Amino acid sequence: MTRTGLSDTIAAIATAPGSAGVGIVRISGPDALGIADGAFRGRRRPSATRGGRFLFGQLVAGDGEVLDEGLCLVFRGPHSYTGEDVAELQTHGSPAVLARVLSRVLELGARPARPGEFTLRAYLAGRLDLAQAEAVLELVNAGTETARRQAALGLSGALGERVERIAAHVTRTLAALQAMLDYPEEGVPDEDRTVPLAAAEAELHALVGTARAGQVATRGARLALIGRPNAGKSSLLNALLGYERSIVTPIPGTTRDYLEAQLSLAGVPVTLVDTAGLRETGDEVEAAGVRQAVRLAESADLVLVLEDGSQPRDHLPAELPRETRMLRVRTKADLPAAWTDPGALDVSAVTGQGLSALRDAIHTALIGDAAQGEAWLTTERQADAARRALTHIQAARSLPDDLAGYELEEALRALADLTGRDVQDDVVDAVFRNFCVGK
C-alpha cells in the first residue's frame, strides 16, 4: 500500500455490499467535518458539533436534492478510530443511496479510500498496534465463536499486553546483565538475571504454543477422512454434519472423487474431506482417487483414519508421513466387535455412539491446550516473530554473560516486530493489503 496521500481526507462505504437496513459512508481526515457540512443538512452543522454527538437530518446532493434521511455521527481527533476528525453518514442501506452519498462526498473534496486505509491511519496514529490491526480483519471475517472471541481479544490489546509482559522480563534481565558487566563490584544477584529470563522463556514458549490453535481458529482446518472401502467414511461425514451430504452404499468403491463439506466443531471452522477408499485396484479411475486421497491426507491439518470394527483388522495399504496428525477411529461400534484398540475411538454413525467424544478429540487435536481466555497468535507473521524471540532467549540462556546481551536485544526486536512497534513498511503493507476499502 502506498504511503502517499495520508494527509488527504478520505471516504468510502463502510458497510457490506448489498441492500440492508442501514448503510454507512465514512469520512476521515482534516476536512472530514467540512465535507460532511456539504452532504448533510440538519439543525446543526457537523463542523459546529462536539465530538461524540450525532445529528438527524437529510443527505443532500449538490443541487439540493434530498437523497435520504439519516444520521451524521461526529468524532473529533484524536478521539476517533483513525485519530483524525471523522464523520459517519448513516443512511438506509440502499446501494443506490450509498453510491449517491459517496459521490457527493467525493465531489466535495474527499478522495476514495484505499483498502485498509482507515485502519492504517489508526495504526500510524498509535490508536492500534499491528496485532490489533490484524484483529480488525479477523473480526470482520470471523465465522465462528472461537474466531470471534480471539479477534475480540486481539482487538482489545490482550496480545500486545501479553507480549509486553514478556518484553519486561527480557528488559529486566538485560538491565541486570549490563549492570553486572559495568559495575562488577556491586555484586548483582544471579537471580536478578536468571529468574526473569526463565519467566520470559516459559511465557514465550506458551505463547508460541498457541500459534496452531490461533491459525486454525481464524482460517479453519481441513480434516480428511481416510480408510479402506466401506470403512464408514461417508456415513461418518453425514453423521458429523447432521444431514446426508455423501452417498452411502454397501458397494465398495462408491466414493471415487473427494467430497468436501463445512461445519463448525466446538467453535472451530472445519472442512471435512471424504476421500476414496484406500486399496489396490486395477481400475484406473479408482486408482487415481486413491492417489488423490493420500495427497489430501498429507496436506490436511488432521486425518481421521477409519477402520471397520466389525471386520478383521486390515491396516491401510498407504503410509502417511510421520508428522501427520491423526486420530484412529473404530467404526460400526453398534455391531459385534471383531477387534478392539484402546488407542482408537469407538464410533457408530448409525446410533451416534461416540460422536460427542470424537468431536471433543478433534477439537483437542486442533486447538491443543491453548487457554481459551488468553490471546493467541493468529497469523504466521506473529508466530514467526514469537519463534525468533524464543530462539534468541534460549540462546542467551546458554551463553556467557558478556555474549548474552546481543541475543536479548535481538529478542526484544523480535517482540517489537510482533506488535508492530518496530517493523518494516513492507510488512505493514502486507498486513493491510487484505482489508476491504471501508476499513
Curated annotation (Swiss-Prot):
InterPro entries: G_TrmE (IPR031168), GTP-bd (IPR006073), GTP-bd_TrmE_N (IPR018948), GTPase_MnmE (IPR004520), MnmE_dom2 (IPR027368), MnmE_helical (IPR025867), P-loop_NTPase (IPR027417), Small_GTP-bd (IPR005225)
GO molecular function: GTP binding; GTPase activity; metal ion binding
SUPFAM superfamilies assigned to the protein according to its UniProt record, in alphabetical order: P-loop containing nucleoside triphosphate hydrolases
Positions bound to K(+): N230, T249, I251, T254
Cofactor: K(+)
Sequence positions that bind (6S)-5-formyl-5,6,7,8-tetrahydrofolate: R26, E88, R127, K439
GO cellular component: cytosol
Residues at which Mg(2+) binds: S234, T255
Family label: Belongs to the TRAFAC class TrmE-Era-EngA-EngB-Septin-like GTPase superfamily. TrmE GTPase family.
Protein's name according to its UniProt entry: tRNA modification GTPase MnmE
Organism: Deinococcus geothermalis (strain DSM 11300 / CIP 105573 / AG-3a)
Lineage of producing organism: Bacteria, Thermotogati, Deinococcota, Deinococci, Deinococcales
